[in-house]
Amino acid sequence: MSAFITFEGPEGSGKTTVLQRVSEKLAQDYQLIATREPGGVPTGEEIRKVVLEGANMDIRTEAMLFAASRREHLVEKVVPALNDNKIVLCDRYIDSSLAYQGYARGIGIEEVKQLNDFAINGLYPDLTIYLDITAEVGRDRILKNQRDQNRLDKEDIAFHEKVIEGYRQIIQETPQRFAVVDATRNIDDVVNETYEIILNFLK
C-alpha cells in the first residue's frame, strides 16, 4: 500500500530524529522511503543550500524557491515511490511553507498556498504528524545539542512563536489530516506514540 506521511513542527521539535527512528521500526513490516524538504533530490539539495545557508533574501523569493524545490522533489522521488506502493515519510512539506513564509513572514497563508498548490498539483499528505513544542524549548534544544544553525534557526524567538501560531491555524482549519504529538517529552515516548499513530492509520 502507498501512503504519504509528513512530519512538521518548529525548529528543535525533533522531527528528523523521530522520523528516522519511526522509519526504522516501520521498515520491518512495510516498504518505505524517508526523505526531506527542502532537498531529497540533487536539485532540491542545491536549492536547500541557497535558502538555508545563503544570505538573507526577499521573502517572496524564499517562498518561491521552497516551492520549486518541493516540485522537483515530488516529481523525482515522492510520486515514483507512491506509484511503487511505498510509504513515503517526509521531513517537512507544504505546511512548513504556510507556517514559515505564509504566516511568520507575513506573506499570507492563502497566497503561499496558491503558489504551492501549483507546485504540488493536488498532492496533499494522507497524514501529517505535528510535533508540538514551544519556541523556547526548541531554541534551548538546538543550543544544548550544538546543532549547526541554518538561516531560519537564527531568526529571533518572536519569529518562531509566529511559526507555531501559523501551524496552529493550519491545524485548526484542516484537523482531519493532523495528529498532534507532545514533543516536550522523552524522545522514546515521542517515537513510540508517533509509531502507534502511523500503525493505526495504515491498518
Curated annotation (Swiss-Prot):
Known catalytic reactions: dTMP + ATP = dTDP + ADP
GO molecular function, one term: ATP binding
GO cellular component terms, A-Z: cytosol
Catalytic activity, EC: 2.7.4.9
Pfam families to which the protein is assigned, alphabetical: Thymidylate_kin
Class in the EC hierarchy, top level: transferase
Binding site for ATP: G9, P10, E11, G12, S13, G14, K15, T16
HAMAP family: Thymidylate_kinase
NCBIfam families reported for this sequence: DTMP_kinase
Similarity annotation: Belongs to the thymidylate kinase family.
Protein name: Thymidylate kinase
Gene: tmk
